[in-house]
């Protein structure tokens, strides 16, 4: 583990990877390969140097590939349920929740998140929105949405584990479903720090994303972004 002097206690990376990958159309997305390595393997490799343990929630019938420095648990039927199970599978003080489908994670983003979470208890990687945004109605341009102050949220997201457990417990008690953990913190009226992310942290969701990932991997693997 790479030393992070501003954090006390243990740190764990939690990767909910039990999704079916329907939009990509190639089975469970975490096991799809980019330049000879699965999305999951790339995400684990990017996180492992910064944490004390890596935990992965996998779909039933899909064991953890050999050689990965991680432990696996059975994921839930939703991402939210998988994260809930992962939170109970560790005793770490701080957790980094990361999508396996974001395989290109620069170390600088991780260190910035860990520094921020030591101050605020919750932080997420994010990028200011650069594109023009419009609201559509039945396939037609309706209203322009001002992009000033808008951020596109990425992962990893970093939390004090006790705080994220509290947020998840509140959501479960109220039957509230979410696809984002930082949003559960904000829902309680608590602050979430926005940490500058990286354009390479895009999520592989569609065949077009996969083609882009193949192109990025050629450069990424040659430069070998490392702590």
Curated annotation (Swiss-Prot):
The record marks 147, 203 as: Positions MEP for the nucleophilic attack. The record marks 23, 29 as: Transition state stabilizer. Keywords: Isoprene biosynthesis, Nucleotidyltransferase, Transferase. Pathway: Isoprenoid biosynthesis; isopentenyl diphosphate biosynthesis via DXP pathway; isopentenyl diphosphate from 1-deoxy-D-xylulose 5-phosphate: step 2/6. It is an enzyme of class 2 (transferase). GO terms for molecular function: 2-C-methyl-D-erythritol 4-phosphate cytidylyltransferase activity. It holds the Pfam family IspD. Its EC number is 2.7.7.60. InterPro entries: IspD, IspD/TarI, IspD/TarI_cytidylyltransf_bact, ISPD_synthase_CS, Nucleotide-diphossugar_trans. The keyword Nucleotidyltransferase applies. GO terms for biological process: isopentenyl diphosphate biosynthetic process, methylerythritol 4-phosphate pathway. Catalyzes the formation of 4-diphosphocytidyl-2-C-methyl-D-erythritol from CTP and 2-C-methyl-D-erythritol 4-phosphate (MEP). Belongs to the IspD/TarI cytidylyltransferase family. IspD subfamily. This is 2-C-methyl-D-erythritol 4-phosphate cytidylyltransferase. The lineage of its organism: Bacteria, Thermotogati, Deinococcota, Deinococci, Deinococcales.
């Amino acid at each position: 583990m790479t030393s992070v002097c501003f954090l006390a206690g243990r740190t764990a990376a939690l990767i909910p990877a039990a999704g079916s990958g329907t939009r990509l159309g190639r089975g469970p997305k975490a096991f799809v390969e980019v330049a000879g390595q699965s999305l999951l393997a790339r995400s684990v490799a990017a996180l492992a140097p910064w944490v004390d343990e890596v935990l992965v929630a996998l779909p039933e019938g899909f064991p953890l590939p050999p050689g990965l420095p991680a432990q696996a648990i059975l994921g839930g039927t939703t991402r939210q349920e998988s994260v809930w199970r992962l939170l109970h599978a560790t005793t770490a003080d701080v957790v980094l929740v990361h999508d396996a489908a974001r395989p290109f994670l620069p170390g600088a983003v991780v260190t910035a998140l860990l520094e921020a979470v030591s101050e605020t208890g919750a932080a997420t990687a994010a990028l200011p929105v650069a594109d023009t945004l419009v609201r559509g109605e039945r396939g037609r341009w309706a209203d322009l949405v001002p992009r000033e102050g808008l951020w596109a949220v990425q992962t990893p997201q970093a939390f004090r584990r006790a705080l994220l457990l509290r947020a998840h417990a509140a959501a479960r008690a109220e039957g509230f479903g979410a696809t984002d953990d930082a949003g559960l913190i904000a829902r309680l009226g608590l602050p979430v720090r926005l940490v500058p992310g990286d354009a390479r942290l895009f999520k592989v969701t569609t065949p077009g994303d996969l083609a882009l990932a193949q192109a990025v991997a050629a450069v990424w693997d040659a430069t070998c972004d490392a702590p």
